[in-house]
Amino acid sequence: MDTDILKMQDREVFDAIAGETVRQMETLELIASENFTSRAVMQACGSVMTNKYAEGYPGKRYYGGCEFVDIAEDLARERARKLFGCEYVNVQPHSGSSANMAVLFSVLKPGDRIMGLDLSHGGHLTHGSSVNFSGQMFDARSYGVDRETGIIDMNKVEEMALDFKPRLIICGASAYSQGFDFKAFREIADKVGAFLMADIAHPAGLIAAGLLTDPMPHCHFVTTTTHKTLRGPRGGMIMMGKDFENPMGITIKTKNGPRVKMMSEVMDAEVMPGIQGGPLMHIIAGKAVAFGEALRPEFREYAVQVRKNAASMAERFTSLGYNIVSGGTKNHLMLLDLRNKDVNGKVAENLLHDAGITVNKNMVPFDDKSPFVTSGIRIGTAAMTTRGMKEADATLIAELIDRVITGAAESTIAATCKDVKAEIRSLCLQNPLEGYGVTP
């Protein structure tokens, strides 16, 4: 990328970017929520679109001069609808959390009841955690996974819903390696008169590629991030398979008298002006580019390889004696329970960092350690697959991770990390990130 001007004008920021570029090029990214965008996406995000304010929506802006940003947003919406087969989409949320906030605020009042997957069982902060707005503004109850299988027990979800009677049920996760039975969740939601929201931030790319169950026919609302397995810029999005009249009875005045607003109108108003002002048009342009890329046949090939790599890695970890929560993976990630390895998540994360491998410590179900220590690590294959790595590489990576973890208590661990880091660097340079070079 051309950074000559930045290098001359602000060497400190340039050096930080150059350092991060080298880190991404020469170390292995296994954080499940991270990926690498294309150069085209980065160019769109670094374009003159960043200069334009565009409060409102295409054709209905509060500012003039929006004819070209309107084109970009319309392209993003059109491509997202085609990619996910949805009738409604809003591409303006700044993040997945913003998207979730907009949905919750659009159908709930403070104190209303919600249900979501427990954070320590693989859920997300915005699904009802007590430290998040979702658990502070609303009465939240969490369902979890079975202690023995590590899989969500739908019978227990139904029992909880019938007892708690939530206004909204959330199905989705940030550290759950199995799929979601959206049909079963909808049946439960209908029994208690609840809205159903699917948060597909992690598997969105795999769903778009047709590899995992489609939530659109079953869920009232679907939210996602646009990075992770979608390989777009960091951002959020809200979708609905079908638009419908809002059941809250919100009306709008027309020349023929009041009419009930469609849910799409309510949602658009909740995003802007409800929780946001001006959209990030440079990011929306990047989203449009990423969605266009995801519509190509090569993207499905990529998504298939992501799952193959995850399956191969999980299989090797299991053969090496690791416990994978839920027993395996059906998507791009896995959660390793390290309690039988006498290493906590914090130590494992730090040692692997020294070995050139980036993961994140993560709580496991029924964890007795704090979120700052944890008993597990979360691993994902989306980013390594973008580099072109295949199943044999995934197997090798599992073996290299095992060398570090099993040697954690040895006096030679520093040397082990150094050796593994050299192997990882070689592997990364054999599978380069094209066009990411920055000259220090």
UniProtKB/Swiss-Prot annotation:
Q: InterPro entries under this entry?
A: PyrdxlP-dep_Trfase, PyrdxlP-dep_Trfase_major, PyrdxlP-dep_Trfase_small, Ser_HO-MeTrfase, Ser_HO-MeTrfase-like, Ser_HO-MeTrfase_PLP_BS, SHMT-like_dom
Please tell me where this protein is predominantly located: cytoplasm
Binding positions for (6S)-5,6,7,8-tetrahydrofolate per the UniProt entry: 119, 123-125, 370-372
The EC number(s) attached to this protein equal 2.1.2.1
Q: Which CDD domains match?
A: SHMT
* Record Pfam families: SHMT
Task: Print the keywords alphabetically.
Answer: Amino-acid biosynthesis, Cytoplasm, One-carbon metabolism, Pyridoxal phosphate, Transferase
Which Gene3D superfamilies does the protein's record reference? Aspartate Aminotransferase, domain 1, Type I PLP-dependent aspartate aminotransferase-like (Major domain)
Localization of this protein: Cytoplasm
Chain positions of site Plays an important role in substrate specificity: 227
What GO MF annotations does this protein's record show? glycine hydroxymethyltransferase activity; pyridoxal phosphate binding
Q: Which PROSITE patterns match?
A: SHMT
Task: Provide GO CC annotations from the record.
Answer: cytosol
Keyword Transferase annotated: yes
Pathway listed for it is: One-carbon metabolism; tetrahydrofolate interconversion; Amino-acid biosynthesis; glycine biosynthesis; glycine from L-serine: step 1/1
Modified residue N6-(pyridoxal phosphate)lysine is at which positions?
A: 228
Q: Which cofactor does it need?
A: pyridoxal 5'-phosphate
Q: What class of enzyme is it?
A: transferase
Give a short account of what the protein does.
Answer: Catalyzes the reversible interconversion of serine and glycine with tetrahydrofolate (THF) serving as the one-carbon carrier. This reaction serves as the major source of one-carbon groups required for the biosynthesis of purines, thymidylate, methionine, and other important biomolecules. Also exhibits THF-independent aldolase activity toward beta-hydroxyamino acids, producing glycine and aldehydes, via a retro-aldol mechanism.
The family line of this record is: Belongs to the SHMT family.
Q: What is this protein called?
A: Serine hydroxymethyltransferase
- Protein species of origin: Chlorobium luteolum (strain DSM 273 / BCRC 81028 / 2530) (Pelodictyon luteolum)
